[in-house]
Amino acid sequence: MVQRMTMAWVKWLGCAGLLLLLSGPVMAAEGVLEILAAGDVLLGGRMLEAPQAGELFGPLTRRRLEQADIFLWNCEIAGLSSVSKQNTFVFHADGLLFPQMAFANGAACTANNHVFDGLEEGAANLMAVLEGARIRHNGLHDRGTFAPLSLLPQREPPVYLLTGSPMSQIGSGPRIVTLSYPQLLEAVRTLRAREPEACIILYSHDGNEGFSEASDRQRLWADWFAAAGADIILFAHSHCYGGFETLEASPRKTFVAWGLGNFLFGGNRGWRSRSDVRLLSIRLDMATGGKSACWLYGKTKNWQFSLYRMDESVLRQVQDLGARAAAIVGQPPVEGNGQEKADEGFGLGSLFLFWKNL
């Protein structure tokens, strides 16, 4: 009874807060970085079927992606190789669509369970395709030469990306490899000891496919990565949009996103034209280390991604307030921390649906 009354009060407070937020958008403070994180990107597979993918982004959506300080995405595909034979679960890229992912603020994560679909030959060709399209990447490397990727070279303190996976060693080597979890952990420790003020973003390809909840392995290693000094930890592999949280007991109040889901995912025809495709927007206060996040909602139509027209400042605060309200009454946040399904227009229906499901 008490919990039902508390929940009713939280919903009323949330609706009232939403109306106040709608009346006055909140501007981002100076010194705050925005990191856009996309899940699995597979520029091949079903995208090559008629009608083939054309433009991946409309001009307004592309402009929004360019406005972020950093745009990260998981490159879940191999390059062409002599063993290339496309099927339902093995994918190889010809590289034709890659120039459309060449954002000046962007970087691809190349440690996952598909980068070695073409063995070392395919991995080498993927690296060549990325470099030819002027896309920075971290993950694949010549054995013994791994280095964190500096995302904002002119900025102090520096921001680095480190990428690894417990599942990307199959088919690797002998020369081209990715980091395993123990190697990734040591890389975080080494970087933190060398640059104590740096911001460390860690991407790991891990999780249980088809499940939005974090796996035991994810939680175990997230705690270890956080203790080693990671500021932000991003997971993808499950193909689901998971929750996100701050590990309050960690030394740097590490932010963790448990599942980035799919983005431009040519591995499944269902993502050709889909009404709910998301990006995670993370804001990092470089002065205080504070972090917040919200989902940005969009859709695909014949593989072209476009964002819905929503007031992002409202969306951000509603999702943050919802997560805190759920914590007050001892319940986990609504799955995915947001809408069940994005809708067109200004997204108010989805915001009210969020409160209804709280």
Model-derived features with residue positions:
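Conserved beta-sheet core of the metallophosphoesterase superfamily
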Residues: 104-107, 216-278
